[in-house]
């Protein structure tokens, strides 16, 4: 019985790139190799406009499950490779069609003749291949406009690819082509989605989390570690910086008027994150802010908070409503972790009436009454840093180390 031997990957947005496309292709190939480490028999060949993954006996479903989370892949097809002879092509098309799952009633044939010396023209091949499928199936008809299955045949010199099963990739650009950012990872629903969408644009992320023991628990800290771990499904690794924030928050609560405590707290977070970004050679800061969602996410608040950093602040969720954000969180696997009922530092010392239109002048005046610099230095110096990788990759590395 014929089975899938290849997966053909299409790049999508990467095809719009010019002279630097080779960098994008190389990065994507590297990311795919990392993602498929578990499958030692696989061979990958990346060309200018497509990637070919030779399965060599590996389970195509298991491989496909990992490919769907790799940014930079627009679509991919499970494919069979047959000799470029009419009878072989007909048999391959039927075999591929019969492997399609689900309620299939209609199909069409699409032929692309890369090898122009093939003895039959496209219009001659269509009825030959389609007729063979009709003769060997029941209750199946041709529908060229809206078929359940499109049987794609690519004819080349010496061999042809037969494809039916087309699957969507994650889209976007390969992680690593767009530099690095620091993402503020609070533990809520929004910030992991912001990290995901940032990675989708080809940007590597490192996460910064502020925790305030004993006001925040170890379980709240573990929740953030689990979120960062979940995000590794979409990249090679996530470096997480856990910043002790208790003394900063206690001082803000004592020295700053309550209406401005939230604004000043966010400004301190930005200052600390900028310091870490400088250490880690990051180029921007990403947050999970959505315009108007809470008091610290009004335009006035963002204007005042942005003052303390020279780094670009990326806000992927800025125009989304909560339901849109939740939908993405559910799709990427972070929602159930985010809703664990453990408080983060943003809920500590929450003012009754936070300013929704804070002014820079007032924030600067309040901060000038106390020197926060030593507290910022201490928070940066005492941060805990951990590197998280996909669980399967870590297990493979530990298994390898046990051999020595």
UniProtKB/Swiss-Prot annotation:
The gene is thiI. One of its GO terms (cellular component) is cytosol. Its EC number is 2.8.1.4. This is Probable tRNA sulfurtransferase. It holds the Pfam family THUMP. Keywords: ATP-binding, Cytoplasm, Nucleotide-binding, RNA-binding, Thiamine biosynthesis, Transferase, tRNA-binding. Belongs to the ThiI family. The keyword Cytoplasm applies. Pathway: Cofactor biosynthesis; thiamine diphosphate biosynthesis.
């Amino acid at each position: 019985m014929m089975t899938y031997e290849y997966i053909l990957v299409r790049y999508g947005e990467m095809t719009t790139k010019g002279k630097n496309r080779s960098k994008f292709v190389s990065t994507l190939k590297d990311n795919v190799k990392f993602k498929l480490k578990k499958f030692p028999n696989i061979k990958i060949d990346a060309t200018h406009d497509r990637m070919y993954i030779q399965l060599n006996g590996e389970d195509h479903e298991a491989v496909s499950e990992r490919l769907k989370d790799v940014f930079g892949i627009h679509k991919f097809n499970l494919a069979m490779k047959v000799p470029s002879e009419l009878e072989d092509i007909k048999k391959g098309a039927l075999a591929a069609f019969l492997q399609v799952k689900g309620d299939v009633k209609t199909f069409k044939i699409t032929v692309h003749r890369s090898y122009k010396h093939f003895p039959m023209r496209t219009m001659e091949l269509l009825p030959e291949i389609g007729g063979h499928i009709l003769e060997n199936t029941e209750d199946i008809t041709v529908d060229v406009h809206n078929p359940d299955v499109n049987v794609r045949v690519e004819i080349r010199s010496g061999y042809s690819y037969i494809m039916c099963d087309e699957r969507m990739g994650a889209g976007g650009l390969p992680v690593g082509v767009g530099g690095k950012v620091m993402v503020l990872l609070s533990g809520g629903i929004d910030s992991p989605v912001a990290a995901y969408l940032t990675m989708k644009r080809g940007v590597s992320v490192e996460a910064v989390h502020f925790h305030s023991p004993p006001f925040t628990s170890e379980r709240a800290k573990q929740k953030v570690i689990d979120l960062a771990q979940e995000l590794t499904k979409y990249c090679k690794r996530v470096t997480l910086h856990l910043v002790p924030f208790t003394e900063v928050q206690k001082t803000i609560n004592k020295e700053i008027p309550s209406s401005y405590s939230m604004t000043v707290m966010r400004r301190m977070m930005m200052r600390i994150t900028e310091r870490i970004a400088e250490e880690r050679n990051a180029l921007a800061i990403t947050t999970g802010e959505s315009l108007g969602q809470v008091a610290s996410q009004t335009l006035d608040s963002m204007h005042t908070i942005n003052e303390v950093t020279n780094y670009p602040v990326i806000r992927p969720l800025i125009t989304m409503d909560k339901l849109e954000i939740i939908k993405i969180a559910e799709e990427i696997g972070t929602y159930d972790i985010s809703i664990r009922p453990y408080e983060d530092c943003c809920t500590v010392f929450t003012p009754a009436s936070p300013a929704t239109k804070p002014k820079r002048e007032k924030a600067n005046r309040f901060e000038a009454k106390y020197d926060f610099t030593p507290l910022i230095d201490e928070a940066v110096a005492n941060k805990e840093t951990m590197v998280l990788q996909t669980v399967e990759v870590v297990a493979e590395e530990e298994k390898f180390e046990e051999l020595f």
